[in-house]
């Protein structure tokens, strides 16, 4: 779990450096799954950073938009930083595809009222960044 310590240190530095930067807790279930992935530590950091950023977007409102938008942008920047040192092209393509897919699903989710369909979409969104790496297999698309 060195990766988790690494990202927590980075976020603590950002919090002390930028007063508007806000942290939200990492998703405990996602952390547990990331722990078991057979990928580089930086890829694990990237997954946690982008997962947290995308979840944080769901909490943005008029009262917190200044700090939360900044925070999601900073977390997204960390995502790109972790994937660039060294450059993990395959993981970059897989995970940026996941970001696009989550944005599509969130748009679809806004139009759905059926509870079962909403549950299924929320489940897909929740596991999106982990799914490509489950069972030590990299899956590029969700078609």
Curated annotation (Swiss-Prot):
Function: Catalyzes the condensation of three molecules of isopentenyl diphosphate with farnesyl diphosphate (FPP) to yield (all-E)-hexaprenyl diphosphate (HexPP; C30), the precursor of the prenyl side chain of menaquinone-6. Large subunit Hexs-B catalyzes the condensation reaction and the final product chain length is cooperatively regulated by both the Hexs-A and Hexs-B subunits using the whole size of the hydrophobic cleft as a ruler.
Gene: hexs-a
Record's keyword terms, sorted: Menaquinone biosynthesis, Transferase
Top enzyme class: transferase
UniProt EC number: 2.5.1.83
Originating species: Micrococcus luteus
Assembly and binders: Dimer of heterodimer or heterotetramer composed of a small (Hexs-a) and large (Hexs-B) subunit.
GO BP of this protein: menaquinone biosynthetic process
Name of the protein in question: Hexaprenyl-diphosphate synthase small subunit ((2E,6E)-farnesyl-diphosphate specific)
């Amino acid at each position: 779990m060195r990766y988790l310590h690494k990202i927590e240190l980075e976020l603590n530095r950002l919090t002390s450096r930028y007063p508007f930067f806000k942290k939200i807790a990492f998703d405990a279930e996602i952390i547990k799954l990331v722990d078991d992935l057979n990928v580089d530590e930086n890829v694990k950091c990237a997954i946690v950073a982008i997962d947290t950023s995308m979840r944080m977007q769901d909490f943005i409102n008029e009262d917190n938009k200044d700090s939360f938008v900044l925070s999601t942008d900073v977390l997204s920047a960390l995502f790109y930083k972790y994937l660039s040192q060294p450059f993990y092209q395959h993981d970059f393509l897989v995970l940026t595809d996941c970001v696009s897919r989550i944005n599509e699903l969130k748009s679809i989710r806004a139009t759905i009222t059926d509870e079962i369909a909403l549950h299924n979409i929320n489940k897909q969104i929740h596991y999106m960044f982990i799914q490509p790496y489950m069972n030590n297999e990299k899956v590029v698309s969700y078609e």
